[in-house]
Amino acid sequence: MAEAEDQQNFVAHNGDQVPDQGSDELHNGLPYQVHDETLVHQPYEVEDPILEPQQYEVPDPTLEPQQYEVPDQTLEPQQYEVDDQLEYHQYQLQDQANEDVQDHSQDDLQYQPQNQEQFQLQDEAHDQAQYQAQGDVQDHNGDEVQDKVEDEEGIPEHLESLQKSEPEEDATVGGEEKRWPGWPGETVFRMLVPAQKVGSIIGRKGDVIKKIVEETRARIKILDGPPGTTERAVMVSGKEEPESSLPPSMDGLLRVHMRIVDGLDGEASQAPPPSKVSTRLLVPASQAGSLIGKQGGTVKAIQEASACIVRVLGSEDLPVFALQDDRVVEVVGEPTSVHRALELIASHLRKFLVDRSIIPFFENQMQKPTRQMDHMPPPHQSWGPPQGHAPSVGGGGYGHNPPPYMQPPPRHDSYYPPPEMRQPPMEKQPHQGISAYGREPPMNVHVSSAPPMVAQQVTQQMQIPLSYADAVIGTSGSNISYTRRLSGATVTIQETRGVPGEMTVEVSGTGSQVQTAVQLIQNFMAEAGAPAPAQPQTVAPEQQGYNPYATHGSVYAAAPTNPPGGYATDYSSGYGY
């Protein structure tokens, strides 16, 4: 039994069939009992302590520490050191550039604390600090660029120096841009308005102008001007509000302009609206230069945006009550386009502020003629013939003598020059007024060194054949009404006593008004007469009569029922001036 059990144990252990032998027999020289002890213990003791520990312990102490510890100790510190050196070099270059640009040493100190703070930041916030430093540099340089732009816009040097010396905390309003020169101050606009349009601004019992003042918070005053003037200056002022796109002064100006264009006076309901209107502003010469801009860039942009013609007229086109350094800004175009151009012009000029204490000075100076009053001619003199010697154009046959009233004696030429000087040939006339819309300014008398016009009342009489009555009066009085509206003069027509076949046309008003009315009457007569001579400005032969003035028909004459813009539009319709 024992032998059988030993044989079964051996077979279970080795998996081999062992011959049935006794326990004292040797198997390969070894007893079965000894062979069993070695074979049973050796396979498990050799494999377990050698193979298994090497399989799990070797990778842990050798490979894994090298894989994670080496990059942390070598690569990452080197990478951040290189970045810090490059950024430090970059800040050094920025500091050097700022030292070259800035005049004050304080600007350099602004960057040193920032650079020191940059290097103290942790690595994870490093990028954010870098962007912040770059933003500071851009803001610093941006202030300098803004100063240069404002200098180019025409800010006077003495105001520019005051502006730079102001503290930074007071330099901005509403977080936008620097305050304008003269701050705090008021914006003042002066618009020239025909006298007959003043009523549409005031309204019945002043209700219209009172409503505009209450709604816009602007101050509106209509200046009377010297006696005899056909225009009035409407001054609109108000406290400037830079944060507002439509400050009180601009709002008031635009509303006054709308009343002039769409006024509800009696004339507006009788005449159709014209296709072209004209608006004129009085501005100081310095503001006019700023409005033109460098190489005309500013005024060109306004013209393109509004589809209007915007021009700055010379000193010869100033009204008698204008200040010496004033200029006239004229806008011509369709009513809506002119309104848009006026808004753009006011937006550009609103930055020129005026102290409120100076506004009464404007009011007082503009209510009296200020332009060379010492050259005013005596009351008994005019550019026409001596009183009591009315010129005779007809008598003895029409055109028998040249019109003597167009060539007064030298002693009567004191202020208004003779027609040869007042009306040069068309090809030699300077480009003034609104020639694109059918007229030149009626006051072309300011030539050479002649003084400007003054509000002196004169009277002119003309003897005209009755055959020209229809041309002068027009259908249903259209021509004579057109002459009165355009010139502003008083024109009366009556038959000449004792001279059959003639009529007397009497024109009264200021020198410019009389000149314009006479010119218009001559143009109507020329259109009904013979062709013009080759030399329009010379004295005509006897057989040509009024023909010397035919060439001026294109300047003043127009269809009275639908005048083509310019002053004709101003005085013949409800659309302003």
UniProtKB/Swiss-Prot annotation:
Query: Which GO MF term does the entry hold, naming one?
Result: RNA binding
**Protein name per Swiss-Prot or TrEMBL:** Flowering locus K homology domain
Compartment(s) where it occurs, according to its Swiss-Prot or TrEMBL record = Nucleus; Cytoplasm
Task: State whether it acts alone or in a complex, and with which partners, per the record.
Answer: Interacts with HOS1. Interacts with HUA1 and HEN4.
Short name of one Pfam family: KH_1
Entry function: Positively regulates flowering by repressing FLC expression and post-transcriptional modification.
Instruction: Reply yes or no: does the keyword Protease apply.
Output: no
What's a single GO CC term here? nucleus
| Native source organism of the sequence | Arabidopsis thaliana (Mouse-ear cress)
Q: Which PANTHER family does the annotation name?
A: KH DOMAIN CONTAINING RNA BINDING PROTEIN (PTHR10288)
Q: Which coarse location class applies to the principal site listed for this UniProt protein?
A: nucleus
Q: What happens when the gene is disrupted?
A: Delayed flowering without a significant effect on the photoperiodic or vernalization responses. The late-flowering phenotype in flk-2 is rescued by the disruption of PEP (pep-2, pep-4).
Q: Which stretches are transmembrane? A: none
Swiss-Prot/TrEMBL GO biological process terms: positive regulation of flower development
User: Which CDD domains is this protein grouped with?
Assistant: KH-I_PEPPER_like_rpt3 (cd22461), KH-I_PEPPER_rpt1_like (cd22459), KH-I_PEPPER_rpt2_like (cd22460)
Q: Which SUPFAM superfamilies does the protein's record reference?
A: Eukaryotic type KH-domain (KH-domain type I)
Task: Give residue ranges for domain KH.
Answer: 186-253, 276-345, 457-521
Q: Which InterPro entries match?
A: KH_dom, KH_dom_type_1, KH_dom_type_1_sf
Q: Which UniProt keywords apply?
A: Cytoplasm, Nucleus, Repeat, RNA-binding, Transcription, Transcription regulation
